[in-house]
Amino acid sequence: MIKEIKSKSRFVILITLSFLVIILSFLISALTPLAKYKFLSDDPIHFKILATIAASYDATVIGFNSIRTILDNYNPNQPINIPKIELIVEPGSIQKMASNLPSSAREKYYNAQLLYPDGQTHDVKYRFRGRSIYHWNPKKPSLRIKTSRKNPFEQLRHFNLINPEDRAMISNFYGEYLADKMGILTHNTKFVELFINQKYVGVYHFTTNDDEEMLRANDRVPGPIYVGDDLADRWELDQFKTKGDLKAHKNLLPLQILLDAIYAESSTNQIDSLWNILSKEKYAKFNALLSLVGGIHTDTTHNHLYYFDPSQGRIEPIISDINGHGLLLYPSPRERLVKKYKPFVEVPLNGRNNPLLDKALRDPDFRHLRNKFLYKYLTETGSFETQRAELQKLFKIIDPSVRKDRNKASIMETFVGYWRIPYSNFQYEKSKIVIFDWIQKRNEFLMQELANSNVTYEIKNISTNTTLLEVIVEGNSSVFFNLNGLGKNVFTRNANSEKEKIFGQNILHPGLAEKPVTWEVGRQVYDYQLGADSKKYLFEIESSYNIDRLINILGSAFKNAVTGDAIVPKLYSKTEELDENKVYVRSEDIKKTTNKVHILGPGEVILTSNLIINNGEELIVKPGSTILMADGVSLLSKGRTIFDGSPENPIEVKRLDEDKPWGIVAIHGPMSKGSIIKNVTFSGGSTSFLENRMFSGMLSISWTENFLMYNSTVENNVISDDTLHVIHSSFKISNSNFKNCFGDCIDFDYSRGKIRRLKINNAKNDGIDFMRSDVDASHIEVLSAGDKGFSVGEMSNIKITSSMIDSSEIGVAVKDMSLLEIENATLSENQVAMSIYSKNWRFGGPGKIIIKNVEFLLNNVDLDIEETAQVQIFDGVNVNVTTGDGSFSYVR
């Protein structure tokens, strides 16, 4: 009996010791890389030792979490809802990349094979990606894949497979999803399962790279991309990496112009110069989103990504690596000992400061615009209810893949820096609860911040002739001040006693102050943060106005300009005399709504300098006008524009001097929606570099909706690539003529619409060029195009009916995964009637043509078909001569 008890005791001791040895081995294996990483740093030796000792706590967390992941259970029979990426990699290559970090991580690409969606396997190159040790763990590394030009993957030559950084795996993905819904440029990202050498590695984010392919995936014009990840306190041009298409740099250096605006002396002109190169709307949306999701990853020194859009002449920010929804807001290592492990909620409205944001926030119009976008997000796209529903749907999709991922780990700040911490399925489920709780509290906090808007006032009779109203606005949101009921003569006064008459509804902005950084203890990023303050406004009212009635009217004259809530002002009873030197606002700080209309004609109008119609203004050209344009002079309208010609009284836009071409006529931007050109002849123009943008079309239509043009002629341009250029717009163009075109007669880029009854004659290049556009064309005649009658490229979707292409080099060309359906058409006396081929390697193939009831007459070649092209010919179409390696099929 005693022997049996001793035997059981020894067994229990053995099991206990074995368990302790296992735990100890986990702790040692966790502590070793932490200590090694710290001892490789430049910190003093005593600090390294102390940090390593403290890191034993982190090692304990890692060790126990590792044990929990081993014990995880999941249902292997659950259906998988996300696509697979399957890589076969060079043996030992992952270990080589991890052998001498950080230098070995990205020093070379290794060979691999990638399974494509069509079931074919192609050779690719791969390496680690990322800037931290978190992304270089051999168990689940973040990777960059490079394909050959011959075999792009989903139209990408470069793409990234990124190990998600948060426990819920959504902080970057969902931030980018929200950005896309809000119209902010961002990466195209999706969840995938990654298999390496037939072994499941885990859940990844498949995402585009910071390059031209990312822009094309977002239907944006290729242009310069600026990457700022190693910036000094004062930004300089050479601190940014420049990528993408740099053709725009021939005319200007957009980033240098932006930097000059940032560091110019503070003034109204400085703010104007900032918004002349930076899109105020896009930057306001960008910062509203950062505020919504608590994104503090973009700071003074890194995570800055910008794109210069050549079609708009403006820089805009790109959402990338946003690390939102609390990822970087968890307690620090020391705080974890006394605080719950939950993300901080009350990141200030203005977030982390940086040189660009610092200047932008000093413009009250920008703050107001940012606040309006934020309020819209909080009540619509980014409301708690909407975010919760969308995330629940997303989790349902990724749950089966996440639960079987035994390599999942998240970023956590440890005593030696940010580190990769494994977590279990239980912790994954708990992270969802934490995120929903954070979103709800964050939204409540932001709504309170936007509701923070207060008004106080004082009425002063400083003489028998003058009653002064002093108004102080304080808080985060601007205030609407309704002057109706205050009499006919209300003036605003500035510090110099200058007066300006005002009326109706006016917007009053609060002040802004530099305040101590209190919310990031121990993590000083900037010397100060910009926060809410007060601003004084001074008004002069009729001296005969009854004071009691005035007080009564003022009680309902103010409301929050963001939330719309009424503001009850407080009457303060200071006895001090008014010191006008304290009134530091200018009259223009009180914003009034204006809608200026510019009218040209009728009769002869001579333009000897550029005419710019600004946002919110309108241009009307009267019937019977003749606009004579001097050498190089242009007309750019950013407001609604009406060329109001009639058959009896048409409009002409032509040269003032027959030998000197004018520049361009351009209609640009969302405020120009609904512009109309009718019964107008444009002739003799060229091109122009205007407002940071090279306009390639004599007549240019860009970034507008519902553009209408009919009964017009566009002809005889010089120098410019296009006679009419339409980009990022919707349109209908009918009953018009285009002739003697220096390049393409019409160029449609990223646009959609209808064209009807057009005659195109003598284009030196293409009759009509389509890129990434959707157009329905009917009754079009193209004669004598020097290159192509119709050029259909870059995934365009075009339908052509009842049309004719005659005497052109190529009648119709279809390229780069475009789709053309052509019906009831005649192609005659062309060198090649139809050609279908690949031009841009990114698209991975030539495309498709559907031919119905088309007549081929006297062409040298009827069809030239590249291998892999799809050509369907319906019964009744006779094809005489074909060339190329491809073939066509008959549809009966």
PLM regions and their residue ranges:
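Internal "kinase-insert"/substrate-recognition segments embedded within catalytic cores
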Residues: 184-187, 199-288
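Short acidic, flexible loop segments centered on an aromatic residue
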Residues: 477-497
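Beta-strand/loop edge motif enriched in small/polar residues
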Residues: 499-892
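Second-shell loop/turn segments in exported
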Residues: 158-167, 242-246, 271-278, 356-359
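N-terminal Sec-pathway targeting helices
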Residues: 2-21
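Conserved NTP-binding catalytic cores of kinases and kinase-like/nucleotidyltransferase enzymes
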Residues: 23-174
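Middle-to-C-terminal accessory/interaction subdomains
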Residues: 32-35, 119, 260-295, 299, ...
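Short, well-structured beta-strand/strand-turn elements
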Residues: 182-193, 627-628
